[in-house]
Amino acid sequence: MVTTATKKTQTSTSTRNKRRPARSGAELTKEQNAESGFTASAELSENLQKVLVDLIELASQGKQAHWNVVGKNFRDTHRQLDEIIEAAREFSDTVAERMRALHALPDGRSDTVAETTTLPEFPQGEIDTAEVVDLVTERLEATIGTCRDVHDAVDEEDPTSADILHAILEKLEQFAWMVSAENRVPAT
């Protein structure tokens, strides 16, 4: 037997648990997100985008170096480049997915990357390992510089995204040290 109190409870529960129909499209994202979570500001989106394009370009230029490196320590340099490329790809995916979690739109298209990266153009043709070491170190340091340039603004708005930058910085700085050590001479 269903009493009036039971009916009220059932009605109240079914009203509370009623889900909204699924929506899609950019116009509704801000409305939905305003109801349920954090939306990245334009500045946060732009800062994460800067890191994203440099990571994508780092992976691309790393592959160019990987294919065209020749000379002493070829095998070690070739393998080390694979490690850098893999890390840059994983980090770019992490940054892009973080942007989506914040309802920002990552843009990894080749024309966007080419137009906005801070990395200098990579030379064509075969390149000696010693030169590759210098070129890759320069690109690692440029990407590190981008992460450091945007860090404080990112941290102020979204500490979680700043934590991602910390992980990127730690690994890229380690790579820069290890790669650059190939061409260093001991201090006398």
Q: PLM features: what roles do these ranges have?
A:
Residues 29-51, 129, 136:
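Disorder-to-helix initiation segments
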Residues 111-167:
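Acidic/histidine-rich alpha-helical segments that form the ligand environment
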Residues 36-43, 58-83, 146-160:
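Helix-loop segments that flank and shape redox-cofactor active sites
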Residues 52, 59, 66, 85, ...:
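A structural signal for well-ordered alpha-helices, especially hydrophobic packing surfaces
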Residues 70, 76-112:
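Conserved alpha-helical segments that form or flank metal/cofactor-binding pockets of metalloenzymes
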Residues 1-31:
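Polybasic, lysine-enriched low-complexity intrinsically disordered terminal tails
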